[in-house]
């Protein structure tokens, strides 16, 4: 499967009377995008704002971050099963608006949305501080249930992203990246001397606003499955998560999965990047055993030499991570795991809730319990009313001088 991704660089965002992309500037008709969001009767009102790198701006509570894309050639459309009709994506041509994102924010959905600071120490902990962000601040109708509000805000972000992506359909990309993988036997014949490597991506699926969607299907309703890595670049996986900010993969991260991109960089050079295996993180032990069994079985059937396993979330999913690692290693497949740690403020506590000697090759994202002090910002998009209750905060987080002291997992 071959996908060409054309990059349209966005250096600035401005509100205007007409939506268009011109000379690296994204002009947004505020009334047009407002009408798109308000098509959903569950959203009472919506406001839009722009946040740029280096500004004294804080966005909170953050629900999702999305990179606008448009399918210009090939099967299906972006966000299949969610916005576009269900069809296999990952081939043809797709254009992406690079250097910007749609950020959904507003009244808190769960208790684990996060913070994006566009400058200061907090900006160093989030990749989204380096983007020009169009922020969608939604206000729900009275009496709406949490899961209904989450869905409404989630879909609002996707609709706005699709609208903006369409502006690039007739443009010429500033650069184009080509990604290609091969069938099982074809790849083996093409790269006979390279190790066969796959990426096992664990998707948050604990429920109660801890959800991820694959082609529109809630991941907790799935079994481990194989995907072509290019499918994620067309939005085949999207976030519905209100899990702790540093522990969730916003949709932007799925679209630009760094593990996928790093493996493609080595594809055909040092490794044969065979495929991507998706597995979930359900809460019941039987589900964990079933999914990890299937994942290990697939690794063996694909005759893999090695896999990289990444985890989403922490605590309960640590068990899924170790089960996957242990069972895949037992099949004779070398395993590297990617996780973060919750080692206490002093870094001396046990990092994960589970462990096994098989997990002897670990890449860590750092200690999420580390304390960070965020300075007062000149402007807040959304509201700071919830910084004491989001995951990582406490009743003393919001200081009288306007600074915020939290564990660093409040940062999105």
Residue ranges of predicted features:
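A general structural motif
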Residues: 256, 282-296
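Extended, charge-rich low-complexity interaction segments
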Residues: 362-394
């Amino acid at each position: 499967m071959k996908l060409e991704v054309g990059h349209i660089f966005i250096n600035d965002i401005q509100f205007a009377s007409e939506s268009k992309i011109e000379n690296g500037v994204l002009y947004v008709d505020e009334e047009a995008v407002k009408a798109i969001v308000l098509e959903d009767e569950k959203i009472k009102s919506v406001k839009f704002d722009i946040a740029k790198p280096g500004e004294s701006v804080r966005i909170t509570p953050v629900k999702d971050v999305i990179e606008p894309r448009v399918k210009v050639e090939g099967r299906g459309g972006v966000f299949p099963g969610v916005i576009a009709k269900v069809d296999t994506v990952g081939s043809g041509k797709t254009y992406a608006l690079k250097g910007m994102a749609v950020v959904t924010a507003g009244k808190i959905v769960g208790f684990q949305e996060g913070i994006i600071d566009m400058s200061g120490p907090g900006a160093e902990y989030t990749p989204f501080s380096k983007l020009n962000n169009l922020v969608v601040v939604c206000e729900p109708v009275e009496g709406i249930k949490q899961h209904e509000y989450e869905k409404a805000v989630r879909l609002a972000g996707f609709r706005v992203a699709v609208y903006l992506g369409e502006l690039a359909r007739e443009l010429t990309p500033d650069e184009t990246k080509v990604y290609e993988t091969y069938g099982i036997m074809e790849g083996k014949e093409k790269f006979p001397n390279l190790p066969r490597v796959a990426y096992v991506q664990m998707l948050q699926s604990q429920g109660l606003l801890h959800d991820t969607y694959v082609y529109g299907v809630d991941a907790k309703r799935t079994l481990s499955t194989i995907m072509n890595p290019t499918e994620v670049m067309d939005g085949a996986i999207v976030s519905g998560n209100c899990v702790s900010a540093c522990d969730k993969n916003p949709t932007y991260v799925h679209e630009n999965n760094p593990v996928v991109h790093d493996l493609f960089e080595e594809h055909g050079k040092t490794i044969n990047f065979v495929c991507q295996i998706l597995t979930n993180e359900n809460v019941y032990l039987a589900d964990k055993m079933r999914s990890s069994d299937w994942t290990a079985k697939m690794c063996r059937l694909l005759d893999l030499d090695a896999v990289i396993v990444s985890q989403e979330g922490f605590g309960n999913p640590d068990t899924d991570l170790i089960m996957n690692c242990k069972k895949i290693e037992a099949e004779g497949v070398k395993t590297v795991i990617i996780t973060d740690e919750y080692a206490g403020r002093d870094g001396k506590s046990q990092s994960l809730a589970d462990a096994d000697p098989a997990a002897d090759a670990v890449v860590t994202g750092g200690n999420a319990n580390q304390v960070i002090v965020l300075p007062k910002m000149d402007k807040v998009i959304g509201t700071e009313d919830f910084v004491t209750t989001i995951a990582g905060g406490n009743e003393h987080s919001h200081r009288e001088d306007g600074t915020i002291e939290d564990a660093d997992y409040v940062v999105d």
